[in-house]
C-alpha cells in the first residue's frame, strides 16, 4: 500500500506567464502595383510590429524599392492601402537623396522637425556667442529640461563614425558616398519609431558597417530594410519577409534560418507538384472516358479536374544571369606601375607605388572610405593622371571599367536603345555573337521589359 505523502507548510510562488503585447506600427493591406502591362505584385499583405528588424527579400525587378516607396508614403499602390499607427514617426533612407545642395552638412542635420535637435542647435549657437549670457542660460535650461546632453553626444558620435567630420562642407561639394552617409546619419540621429532602409551599407567601408551592426543591436528601433549584404542581414535582422512568385512568405529568424527553411519549402512544393501531376494524369484519363451526359457527381469531379490541372501546370520562374566574355589573346605584359605618386593637396594616395599585374590575376582593393580606392582605379585605367611615375599598359589589353556613377542614361530612352548605343551585337566565346536583345535577356530583362522606358 502506497502511503499518501505529507504536505509541508511553506511558501507558494505563483509563476505567471509574461504577456508579450504586439504593437502594430504599420499594416500593408492587399496592395498591388503595375507599370503598364508589367505587374510587380498583386494583393500582398503583411504587417510591421514594434521592435521587429525585418529584411525584405525578392528577386531583382520584382518591386522591392516600389514597396519601400509605398510604405514610406512616397508612392501610391494601384489598389489596397497602407495603414500606420497614429503618432509614430517614420524615416526612410532611399537610394537617392533629395538633400538641398546649397546647405552645409551641419545645416542639413538641423533642418529637421526634431525638437531635441532644435534645442541642441540652439545650445551650440549660444556657445558660439559667449557674450550673450541670457541666450546661453536659456539654451542651457532647455538642454537640462529635455535631457538633451546624451542626444548631443550621440549625434556627434554618429557623424564621426560615418566620417562626416567637416560640418561646414556644402552638400553640393560632397561625393556620392558622402551624401549617402549623410542621409544615413540624418535618419539615425532623428531616432524614428520605424526606420525604412534601402541598401543601407552602400558606400560604407567595413569599419562603418561593423559600427552600424552594433548600433542596431543596442538601439530599440524597428527596422524594415532591403539589402544585398547577406552578412549585414544575418547579424541585424530577426525576421525575413520574402516576395516570391507573387506570394509573401515569413521566416522568424535570421538569414541562415531563412535559407534553410526556404529550401525545405521549395522541396515540399516540388513534392506537391509531382503529386499534382500524377493526379492530373489520372483525372485526364477519366475525363477522356466520360460520356457527354454528366451526372451531378461527375460534374463536381470535372470542376475539380480543372483546379488540379492549374496546380499541375504551375512552374517556378527561376532565372540566373549567365555571362560569357570574349577574351582576346593577351601578350606577356598586362599592366605595370612604376614609382607612381599621386596626391590631392596634402593627402597622399600613392607614394612611390610599384606593382606588376600578371595574366589571370584577380585583385581586390580594400581600404577605408576616402583612402583613394576609386582614385587608384582611375589611375590604372588612365582616366586620371599621376603626379610622377609610370603606368604602362600592355599593347593587347583593353579596359572594361564599371564606375560607381555607371553610364549616362537618358530617362526618355527605352532599355533596348541604351544597349544598342554600344552595339547591335555582342561577341561571345568561340566566335559566337548575340544581339543586344539576347544580352538583355541574360540580365533578366524579358522582351516586354526591354521596351520599357528607363525612367520606369
Model-predicted segments: where are they?
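ABC ATP-binding cassette signature C-motif
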Residues: 9, 14-273, 323-456
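A short, surface-exposed helix-loop junction/capping segment
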Residues: 133-142, 281-289, 318
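Intracellular alpha-helical coupling/juxtamembrane segments of multi-pass membrane proteins
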Residues: 261-294, 298-304, 308-315
Amino acid at each position: 500500500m502506497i502511503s499518501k505523502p505529507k504536505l509541508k507548510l511553506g511558501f507558494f510562488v505563483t509563476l505567471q506567464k509574461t504577456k508579450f503585447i504586439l504593437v502594430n506600427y504599420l499594416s500593408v493591406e492587399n496592395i498591388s502595383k503595375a507599370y503598364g502591362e508589367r505587374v510587380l505584385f498583386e494583393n500582398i499583405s503583411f504587417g510591421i510590429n514594434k521592435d521587429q528588424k525585418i529584411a525584405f527579400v525578392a528577386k531583382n525587378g520584382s518591386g522591392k524599392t516600389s514597396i519601400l516607396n509605398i510604405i514610406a508614403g512616397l508612392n501610391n499602390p494601384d489598389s489596397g492601402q497602407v495603414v500606420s499607427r497614429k503618432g509614430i514617426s517614420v524615416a526612410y533612407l532611399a537610394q537617392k537623396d533629395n538633400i538641398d545642395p546649397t546647405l552645409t552638412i551641419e545645416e542639413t542635420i538641423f533642418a529637421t522637425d526634431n525638437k531635441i535637435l532644435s534645442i541642441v542647435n540652439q545650445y551650440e549657437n549660444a556657445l558660439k556667442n559667449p557674450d550673450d549670457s541670457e541666450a546661453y542660460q536659456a539654451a542651457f535650461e532647455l538642454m537640462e529640461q529635455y535631457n538633451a546632453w546624451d542626444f548631443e553626444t550621440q549625434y556627434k558620435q554618429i557623424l564621426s563614425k560615418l566620417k562626416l567630420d567637416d560640418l561646414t562642407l556644402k552638400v553640393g561639394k560632397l561625393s556620392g558616398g558622402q551624401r549617402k552617409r549623410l542621409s544615413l546619419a540624418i535618419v539615425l540621429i532623428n531616432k524614428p519609431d520605424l526606420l525604412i532602409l534601402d541598401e543601407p551599407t552602400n558606400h560604407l567601408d567595413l569599419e562603418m558597417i561593423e559600427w552600424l551592426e552594433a548600433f542596431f543591436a543596442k538601439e530599440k528601433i524597428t527596422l524594415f530594410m532591403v539589402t544585398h549584404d547577406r552578412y549585414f542581414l544575418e547579424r541585424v535582422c530577426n525576421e525575413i519577409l520574402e516576395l516570391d512568385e507573387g506570394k509573401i512568405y515569413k521566416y522568424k529568424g535570421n538569414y541562415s534560418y531563412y535559407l534553410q527553411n526556404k529550401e525545405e519549402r521549395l522541396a515540399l512544393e516540388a513534392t506537391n507538384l509531382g503529386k499534382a501531376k500524377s493526379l492530373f494524369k489520372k483525372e485526364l484519363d477519366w475525363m477522356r472516358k466520360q460520356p457527354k451526359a454528366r451526372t451531378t457527381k461527375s460534374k463536381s469531379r470535372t470542376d475539380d479536374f480543372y483546379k488540379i490541372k492549374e496546380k499541375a501546370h504551375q512552374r517556378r520562374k527561376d532565372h540566373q544571369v549567365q555571362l560569357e566574355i570574349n577574351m582576346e589573346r593577351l601578350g606577356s605584359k598586362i599592366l605595370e606601375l612604376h614609382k607612381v605618386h599621386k596626391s590631392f593637396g596634402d593627402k597622399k594616395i600613392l607614394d612611390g607605388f610599384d606593382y606588376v599585374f600578371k595574366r589571370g590575376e584577380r585583385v581586390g582593393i580594400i581600404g577605408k572610405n576616402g583612402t583613394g580606392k576609386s582614385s587608384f582605379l582611375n589611375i590604372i585605367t588612365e582616366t586620371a593622371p599621376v603626379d610622377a611615375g609610370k603606368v604602362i599598359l600592355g599593347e593587347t589589353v583593353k579596359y572594361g571599367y564599371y564606375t560607381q556613377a555607371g553610364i549616362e542614361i537618358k530617362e526618355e530612352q527605352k532599355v533596348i536603345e541604351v544597349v544598342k548605343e554600344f552595339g547591335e551585337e555582342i561577341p561571345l566565346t568561340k566566335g559566337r555573337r548575340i544581339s543586344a536583345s539576347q544580352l538583355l535577356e541574360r540580365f533578366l530583362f524579358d522582351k516586354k521589359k526591354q521596351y520599357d522606358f528607363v525612367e520606369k
